[in-house]
Amino acid sequence: MLPSIAKHAALHQVNPLRKHGQNFIFDSSLCDKIVRASNLAENSRVLEIGPGTGGLTRSILQKNPESLTVIETDERCLPLLNEIKEYYPNLNIIKQDALKINLTDLSCDIVNSVGFAYKKREAKPITNRRANDIGESKLIDYKVTIISNLPYHIGTELVIRWLKEARLITSMTLMLQKEVVERICAIPSTKAYGRLSVICQLIAKVEKCFDVAPTAFYPPPKVYSAIVKLIPLENPLSIALINKVEQITKLAFAGRRKMIKSSLKNLVPNIHEVLTQLNINDNYRAENLAPQDYLRIAEIL
């Protein structure tokens, strides 16, 4: 039987390190609550970033997924995670920086095991009957469920990256800084509304689940956290269109208080005609335009 999360960490002398952005969760009931919020279906393929001391990992595994792949960069946590694997053979552990992994680099090895095997770029391709050839790369035709307590310093970057691979994702249930979650879920004409709101809401249905107090962590961070769930919409946007929306929103929200006709004039010299054609008031500011307005501008350019 596994020891408690906190005792397991103590046995392996795993203390949180600032350089890894680590704030550990030792409360198993909170971990269970996060997994419940994900509505994780049995036999799902799950991905977790930064499992650390394995609290959330345990709660996911107790839901009997087909496989759980964890990406951990801290070598100190690997022996601890391998001990959990002794009880749950469907746990796959990859030591890697999460920012260096794309979902398309995670391939299901259906010959030797159920779950994921990481395809290093220099390695021979994994034979996979469940993938479709696209040039030299593989497009996975199954989807993963992502459940993670993300390090604050890379959380937003990972969310944007994953949204660009939304076709591979069933849902994402993520712990992030509360301020970031509020930005993801913000509606137009509010203070929190911005680029992140637009991009997330054009690609996924977003829902804030609940707040998490600093006291839930060791050591306690200086800010509140929150759980957000993102479910990719059907018919995801193309990468080209997402990139265009990113370009437009970067200009628009850089001058947040400027009228949109001024913010975008360097991108589109005839911006007044474009906005008129789309029936968008060119006296609006960036925060007044809905996500769909930005998409319509991107589509017409």
Curated annotation (Swiss-Prot):
Gene3D superfamilies: Ribosomal RNA adenine dimethylase-like, domain 2, Vaccinia Virus protein VP39. InterPro entries: KsgA/Erm, RPE2, rRNA_Ade_diMease-like_C, rRNA_Ade_Mease_Trfase_CS, rRNA_Ade_methylase_Trfase_N, rRNA_adenine_dimethylase, SAM-dependent_MTases_sf. It holds the Pfam family RrnaAD. Its main location: cytoplasm. S-adenosyl-L-methionine binds at residues 23, 25, 50, 72, 97, 149. One of its GO terms (molecular function) is 16S rRNA (adenine(1518)-N(6)/adenine(1519)-N(6))-dimethyltransferase activity. Keywords: Cytoplasm, Methyltransferase, RNA-binding, rRNA processing, S-adenosyl-L-methionine, Transferase. CDD domains: AdoMet_MTases (cd02440). One of its GO terms (cellular component) is cytoplasm. Its EC number is 2.1.1.182. It is found in: Cytoplasm. The keyword DNA repair does not apply. It catalyses: adenosine(1518)/adenosine(1519) in 16S rRNA + 4 S-adenosyl-L-methionine = N(6)-dimethyladenosine(1518)/N(6)-dimethyladenosine(1519) in 16S rRNA + 4 S-adenosyl-L-homocysteine + 4 H(+). NCBIfam families: ksgA (TIGR00755), RPE2 (TIGR03774). Belongs to the class I-like SAM-binding methyltransferase superfamily. rRNA adenine N(6)-methyltransferase family. RsmA subfamily. Specifically dimethylates two adjacent adenosines (A1518 and A1519) in the loop of a conserved hairpin near the 3'-end of 16S rRNA in the 30S particle. May play a critical role in biogenesis of 30S subunits. This is Ribosomal RNA small subunit methyltransferase A.
